[in-house]
Structure formats: structure tokens, C-alpha cells
């Protein structure tokens, strides 16, 4: 979807790192070389990585899918709630990361939150996710 709107896309390979906080460090090292505006998109642990990285670097936006916020064992528990252009999608039936975690963050950040029919992977709601992501990208342009 983002490519349709002329966005460049980079997917960082984290397969060699299981620790979410080390993934944040890798993302920050990649982003420090970036000269253009960018949006971070992350799902589950990737959502945590994206929002945690945005604590340390200026981003145009953050789009999160069932983000692993406020999870035990994750180092960062306070997130930058002052930035604009944060959107979250979370499935009501997520049995891995409670939707209440996204609700808690969205209240603090006063950001867009879409609670939709679906589990952690949101596979049954892919059309809805795609539509919401397209609206998000268009609003940033």
C-alpha cells in the first residue's frame, strides 16, 4: 500500500536477535543514517521496537499492530506520548497481548486506536487493516 503512494520501504532483518531491546538498538542504528522523513510500522514485538525507537529519534509517524506495550521483561515501559501521528490497530480477541495495553497507551498518547474483530495476527481482518493503513498514509501526505 505504501509503495502505491510513492513511499520507499525498508524491512529490517531481526531474525538473529530475539531480545526486543537489542532490536530497538539495531533500528536506531539504521535510522541514524536516514535523511528523509520516515514512518515506523510494527506488529507485536515490532510495535514495541517501533514505539521504543521513537522515544529517541524524530519520526513522521508510528503505525502499530497489536503492539507489545507494557509487557513484562521488556526494558522500556514508558513511551513518548507527546508525538503526533500515532495509530494503533488491535484485535479484540488477542490472547497474546491484551487489547487493554493498547487502550492504556492510546489514552495517554491521545492517539488513534482501532479495536477490531480479530486475534493477535489480525489475519481475518486484513482488508480492514489495509484500509486503515491506507487512510493513515494518505493523511500523512
Explain the meaning of each model-derived region.
Residues 15-17, 116-123:
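Histidine-bearing beta->alpha loop at or near hydrolase active sites
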Residues 101, 123-138:
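Post-His helix in hydrolase/transferase enzymes
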Residues 82, 87-90, 94:
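Short beta-strand/loop motif that positions the catalytic acidic residue
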Residues 1-36:
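Active-site catalytic motif of lipid deacylating hydrolases and related acyltransferases
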Residues 92-111:
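Conserved loop-alpha-helix segment in the C-terminal half of the alpha/beta-hydrolase fold
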Residues 58-70:
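A conserved short beta-strand
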Residues 41-51:
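Gly/Ala-rich beta-loop-alpha elbow adjacent to hydrolase catalytic centers
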Residues 71, 92-97, 120-121:
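Acidic catalytic loop of the alpha/beta-hydrolase fold
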Amino acid at each position: 500500500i505504501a509503495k502505491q503512494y510513492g513511499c520507499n520501504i525498508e524491512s529490517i532483518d531481526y531474525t538473529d536477535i530475539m531480545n526486543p531491546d537489542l532490536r530497538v538498538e539495531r533500528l536506531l542504528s539504521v535510522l541514524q543514517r536516514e535523511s528523509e522523513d520516515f514512518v515506523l510500522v510494527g506488529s507485536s514485538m515490532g510495535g514495541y521496537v517501533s514505539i521504543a525507537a521513537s522515544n529517541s529519534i524524530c519520526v513522521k509517524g508510528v503505525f502499530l499492530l497489536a503492539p507489545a506495550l507494557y509487557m513484562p521483561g521488556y526494558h522500556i515501559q514508558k513511551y513518548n506520548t507527546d508525538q503526533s501521528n500515532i495509530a494503533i490497530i488491535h484485535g479484540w480477541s488477542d490472547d497474546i497481548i491484551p487489547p487493554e495495553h493498547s487502550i492504556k497507551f492510546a489514552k495517554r498518547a491521545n492517539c488513534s486506536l482501532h479495536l477490531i474483530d480479530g486475534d493477535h495476527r489480525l489475519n481475518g481482518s486484513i482488508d480492514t487493516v489495509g484500509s486503515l493503513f491506507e487512510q493513515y498514509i494518505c493523511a500523512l501526505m
